[in-house]
Amino acid sequence: MPTIQQLIRKPRQPKIKRSKSMHLQECPQKRGVCTRVYTTTPKKPNSAMRKVAKVRLTNGFEVISYIPGESHNLQEHSVVLIRGGRVKDLPGVRYHILRGVLDTQGVKDRKQRRSKYGAKRPK
């Protein structure tokens, strides 16, 4: 416990809050180009083949981002838009790819939560 005199000489420093999606640099979304599209397996209690892509952003960073929804049309050199948001059971995946924007198609035959997956309203 510091004395009052010590606090006058050197005041307390506020704690710095670090961003969980620092590569976006305070932007809501960032554009990038896919350098590799592949599947990976989740952490221990879960089992699946999760679709992920390595994306080189316009600011030069290279990040791993998750491709949500069933099936996708992404391949190398596809231009995508990413947002923040981690995938809990995939270590190192801190971003999501937005569906229905730029080169990414929306999820086909999606009826509910369509706006999250870039799907048009069914007729």
Swiss-Prot record:
The keyword NAD does not apply. It comes from the Bacteria. Keywords: Methylation, Ribonucleoprotein, Ribosomal protein, RNA-binding, rRNA-binding, tRNA-binding. It holds the Pfam family Ribosom_S12_S23. One of its GO terms (cellular component) is small ribosomal subunit. Residues 9-21 have a biased composition (Basic residues). CDD domains: Ribosomal_S12. GO terms for biological process: translation. The modification 3-methylthioaspartic acid is found at D89. Belongs to the universal ribosomal protein uS12 family. PANTHER family: 30S RIBOSOMAL PROTEIN S12 FAMILY MEMBER (PTHR11652). HAMAP family: Ribosomal_uS12_B. Part of the 30S ribosomal subunit. Contacts proteins S8 and S17. May interact with IF1 in the 30S initiation complex. This is Small ribosomal subunit protein uS12. It comes from Roseobacter denitrificans (strain ATCC 33942 / OCh 114) (Erythrobacter sp. (strain OCh 114)).
